Amino acid sequence: MGSDANWQSHLVEFRAYIPLPNSNQNILALWSHNWFTLGGTPPYLLLPSAGWDEFSNTGRGYIQGKFKSNNMIYQEAEYRFRVSANGLFSGVVFVNAESFSDPVSGKYEVISPGAGLGIRMKLNKFSRTNIAIDYAWGTQPSKGFLRKSWRGFLKSVFINSTSN
């Protein structure tokens, strides 16, 4: 069993962490995660999709797999700040936008924005492992909680609370 399909894809990712002036504890985190099919037809389950990156972080504000196509562009900005003086608790505010190419034309016609906020609790200051709880909103309607831990300690879970 297997596939005779011949296809190629390329993942282009960029991350930047910018300390904000007048505060050594606040950071602006930028993330660009772009996945392109260069040739052939990939199997459906291997297509780029919302929330299908290594740690299920893309597409906050949407159910995993809500969007899927041959090509994906994802951009995110997250403001990270301390809530408690000792660093046990911190918070985040984030915005993101993702677009998937039309399967036939290959054009990017729809941009799906997302936004949210979250709280972090530090589990281990040496490994910088945090428990994270985010609440995110998306369009079409979509919103819900995302629980996760940095450093892959827990698997991400999006609990959808959409309403029509």
Where are each of the predicted segments found?
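Short glycine-rich, acidic/polar surface loops and turns
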Residues: 76-80, 114-121
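One face of beta-strands
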Residues: 14, 113-117, 131
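C-terminal outer-membrane beta-barrel translocator/porin domains of Gram-negative envelope proteins
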Residues: 1-89, 94, 101-103, 144, ...
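Predominantly the C-terminal beta-signal and adjacent terminal strand-loop region
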Residues: 122-164
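Short small-residue beta-strand/loop micro-motif enriched in glycine and branched aliphatics
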Residues: 100-103, 128-130
